[in-house]
Amino acid sequence: MKTELNLHGRSLTLHRFPKRSNETLQAWDAGDEYLINHVEEMALPDHQNIVVINDNFGALACWFSEKHHVTFMSDSFVSHKGAQKNLEDNQCNKVAFLTTMDSIPANTDLVLVQLPKSNRHLVWILSQLRKILPTACPVIAVNKAKEIHTSTLKLFEKYLGETKTSLAWKKHRLVFSQANAEPRIEVDPITAWDVEGEHIQLKNLPNVYSGESLDLGARFMLQHIPQDASINHIIDLGCGNGVLSVKAGQLNPNVRLTCVDESFMALESAKQNLLDNLGEGRDIQCVANNCLDGFKPDSCDLIMCNPPFHQQHAITDHIAWQMFCDAKQILNQNGKLLVIGNRHLGYDAKLKRLFGDKNVKLIASNNKFVILQATKNPAKLSAKQ
């Protein structure tokens, strides 16, 4: 796996985050290279104010910080940590870090965007750029050519302004735009709806997974969250908008709830949804993190988990494996990990490898999903029992 980015006589050493010894995925892609090549050809004067949005692991921030003032904007905690580590390893100049809910800096000279997977997130970003940027400020976005549709360009034209595209290079294409769309459209960051069949209302910020309706996996999982007075602490790992935590809190009014996600927008949404649906005075914590890094071992009774199988645009199962390994460390003895996943992902084999064959059981299944329960080191029953 390549870790050296070599362009224009310069070299950067770049790693994904967290760094793994058997890593098979690069920390940058051809889209990053296309952006770098194009901006270098622009021959900008030094000390420009460049905003970089959705820079997966900091390749763009590292490159442009040598001569310019860079602001890194991302909704991803993992991207923030990856960029910070790569900046440090390459001894780069200081970069400002913001989330995509923060305001775009007003004195921006150039905006570079790796297009997000979510159209809601894209519309939010475009609307914020239109609100702040002067017309003369170039906005250059990149993605795989097959992911840039006519509908994508129409969103640019509607929410940002005049838009055109480049020729394809290494299966990627650039999108050129500027902030001149009229009229300027205000975008509400919150999408709210009721969960059918539940006493739950959810508010979703733009980059929340399945933010416009409840995904089928979560709907199935809601039916199998336990009600158990012996449970003191529940962790919702990869919490999204917090719907599973809300249900767990309704069923277990005295439980301590910890929501963990790598999306800052997901955590803000979960925090608001828990407050709205459970009220004040509950023992609730929302944590931006890479899985369960830094959590105290043997400190939790139940972990609920719906693992993602993407990291940015890459398909990977290493996040699920890290979640399962972390969960085993954090669970108390006899603590339980409740996992939902698509049937084809084979989580049962992974969990049995980690927890032991006899400690993993099927809780429920339908034609698309399975819910599995893994128990940590079940205590042996005494002879009297």
From Swiss-Prot:
On the tree of life, the source organism's domain of life is Bacteria
Where can this protein be found? Cytoplasm
Its cellular-component GO annotations read:
cytoplasm
Tell me a Gene Ontology molecular-function term this record carries.
23S rRNA (guanine(1835)-N(2))-methyltransferase activity
Span-the-membrane segments of this chain are none
Alphabetical UniProt keywords: Cytoplasm, Methyltransferase, rRNA processing, S-adenosyl-L-methionine, Transferase
Q: What is its EC number?
A: 2.1.1.174
Catalyzed reaction equations: guanosine(1835) in 23S rRNA + S-adenosyl-L-methionine = N(2)-methylguanosine(1835) in 23S rRNA + S-adenosyl-L-homocysteine + H(+)
Q: Does the keyword Glycosyltransferase apply?
A: no
Q: What does this protein do?
A: Specifically methylates the guanine in position 1835 (m2G1835) of 23S rRNA.
Entry similarity comment: Belongs to the methyltransferase superfamily. RlmG family.
- What PANTHER family is this protein classified in? RIBOSOMAL RNA LARGE SUBUNIT METHYLTRANSFERASE G (PTHR47816:SF5), RIBOSOMAL RNA SMALL SUBUNIT METHYLTRANSFERASE C (PTHR47816)
Instruction: Specify the protein name.
Output: Ribosomal RNA large subunit methyltransferase G
Q: Which organism is it from?
A: Vibrio parahaemolyticus serotype O3:K6 (strain RIMD 2210633)
State which gene encodes it. Answer: rlmG
